[in-house]
């Protein structure tokens, strides 16, 4: 939330109290001493325009809508103190930053740009850097505690000293002083002693600059975390354009994705298969699949699927889907334990991989789901098959409890349910209590996954592919078709949604079988792939894929 929008949320009266309270309680703070209630804020409080709670503040809703159906919102002109039509400012730096995934590269790009948006960001960052340099050791003896507090308390991706490292400490000191900022003397002493950063990695150990000893010290508790940046200086066990295999110690490997948004393409599929083969042939104890990015993965590379579907390259698409399925099966049926560590988005193929792993260590803030229906297809990397397998393990061959459980599984896929936390993922069937676990500190998920690999490695026996999957055939299909049509009658689904839902139902029930019976996993994978390919030939599916690629949100057609 931006500064003025946040003020509307908090309330102008509260903002004034905060300013006055800070001036009273922090008299020696050079920034607080300069704080004054601006004219426009006095205007708002005098007129009791407190923000959201009074109906208007810096912004004012009119109740009207523009030609595109969006609410018309007026903004306060800070000079005239009148409300005018708010307009989005065109800032080239934002267009540049949207193209960059890695946070360090984004910060460097901010300081290289020269438009007014970049200048605002630069002034803000330099002011922040100067301020925190003067608060250490006043409020904390260690700089990492300041970073930790702002990351934990305000959900920042990095703390101010970490941002400063990304931008370049010496360069920012020079620019800040030109801007009129006063930098803490200890920072200059650090630079003069030849120490050019606040943090560094030495022999795989992350260290911070300690003011007391004027040297680098290991971060406390660092052994509890596995940060893959700490292994960058080591030669990788394996690498390609989309993933890298690291030796994280104790005979355990970690495969890290680094494609754009960690989307699963040919490189990641090949990397998973090659990495498992390396682990098996070279005698490693097991493998973690995980990364320290904001999101584990957004799922399959949709552009790759779209190109083959538009060009009607059905043999190539069939082969690509088959490779995806066999990669999921390779994760499950290898001679070493494979544990997946997740955080952030775990969509589509990422969810399918996790369902096939020996175990999942999910950060509490993992948003897990099979979202393929939103782009007009079904989960085709083994996810629909795996739901049929899990249903088989839950139900008995007798009793009416079968159909309600079947409908629950069906709804998870057909309505593209995304768990809003790792705990909710258990309710949707994406995680299983007997094998998966949740960690509250996202930074611990890879280290916990490594511990799980070591726990499983002793006496690990490669599973045998299932040929005893109990499916309901026509008995289940009838119930699911009724459930699908009830969604349409309730205006929750379109005709194309129903077509997709019926394909999901077909796989979950093992096809149009005359009676309930047992089938093999490969049988289910074959019909899953058949249903996936049939939907790729639908015009409405192609429209959904194109709309998602162009707009980043699903089309309901």
Locate each region found by the language model:
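Short alpha-helical segment that forms part of, or immediately flanks, the ligand-binding pocket
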Residues: 352
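N-terminal glycine-rich phosphate-binding loop for ADP-containing cofactors
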Residues: 1-294, 303-323, 327-336, 343-347, ...
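Extended, composition-driven regions rather than compact fold-specific motifs
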Residues: 298-300
């Amino acid at each position: 939330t931006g500064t003025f929008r946040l003020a509307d949320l908090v309330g102008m009266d509260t903002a004034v109290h905060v300013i006055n309270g800070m001036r009273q309680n922090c008299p020696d703070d050079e920034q607080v001493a300069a704080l004054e209630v601006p004219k426009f804020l006095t205007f708002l409080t005098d007129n009791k325009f407190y923000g959201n709670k009074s109906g208007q503040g810096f912004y004012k809703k009119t109740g009207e809508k523009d030609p595109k159906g969006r609410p018309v919102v007026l903004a306060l002109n800070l000079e005239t103190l009148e409300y005018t039509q708010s307009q989005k400012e065109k800032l080239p730096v934002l267009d540049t930053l949207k193209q960059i995934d890695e946070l360090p590269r984004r910060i460097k790009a901010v300081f290289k740009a020269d438009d007014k948006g970049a200048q605002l960001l630069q002034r803000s960052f330099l002011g922040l850097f100067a301020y925190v340099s003067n608060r250490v050791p006043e409020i904390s003896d260690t700089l990492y505690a300041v970073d930790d507090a702002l990351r934990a308390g305000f959900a920042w991706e990095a703390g101010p000293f970490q941002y400063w490292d990304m931008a370049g400490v010496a360069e920012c000191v020079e620019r800040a002083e030109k801007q009129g900022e006063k930098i803490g003397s200890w920072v200059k002493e650090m630079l003069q002693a030849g120490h050019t950063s606040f943090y560094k990695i030495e022999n795989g150990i992350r260290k911070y600059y300690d003011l007391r000893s004027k040297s680098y010290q290991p971060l406390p508790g660092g052994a509890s975390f596995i940060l893959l940046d700490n292994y960058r200086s080591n030669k990788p066990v394996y690498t390609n354009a989309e993933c890298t295999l690291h030796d994280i110690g104790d005979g355990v490997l970690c495969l890290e994705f680094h494609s754009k948004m960690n989307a699963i393409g040919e490189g990641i599929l090949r990397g998973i298969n090659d990495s498992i083969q390396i682990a098996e042939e070279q005698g490693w104890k097991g493998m973690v699949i995980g990364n320290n990015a904001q999101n584990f993965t957004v799922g399959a590379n949709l552009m790759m699927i779209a190109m083959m579907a538009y060009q009607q390259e059905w043999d190539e698409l069939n082969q690509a889907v088959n490779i995806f399925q066999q990669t999921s099966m390779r994760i499950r049926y290898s001679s070493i334990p494979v544990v997946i560590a997740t955080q952030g988005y775990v969509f589509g193929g990422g969810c399918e991989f996790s369902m096939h792993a020996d175990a999942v260590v999910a950060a509490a803030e993992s948003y897990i789901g099979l979202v393929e229906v939103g782009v007009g297809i079904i989960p085709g990397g083994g996810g629909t098959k795996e739901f049929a397998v899990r249903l088989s393990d839950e139900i008995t061959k007798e009793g009416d409890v079968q159909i309600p459980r079947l409908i629950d599984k069906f709804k998870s896929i057909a309505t593209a349910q995304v768990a809003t936390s790792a705990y909710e993922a258990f309710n949707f069937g994406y995680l299983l209590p007997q094998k998966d676990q949740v960690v509250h500190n996202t930074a611990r998920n890879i280290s916990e996954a490594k511990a799980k690999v070591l726990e499983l490695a002793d006496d690990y026996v490669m599973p045998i592919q299932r040929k005893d999957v109990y499916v309901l055939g026509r008995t289940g299909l009838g119930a699911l078709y009724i459930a699908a049509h009830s969604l349409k009658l309730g205006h929750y689904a379109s005709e194309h949604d129903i077509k997709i839902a019926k394909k999901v139902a077909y796989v979950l029930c093992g096809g149009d079988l005359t009676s309930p019976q047992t089938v093999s996993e490969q049988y289910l994978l074959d019909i899953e792939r058949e249903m996936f390919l049939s939907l790729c030939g639908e015009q409405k599916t192609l429209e959904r894929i194109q709309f998602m690629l162009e707009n980043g949100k699903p089309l309901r057609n």
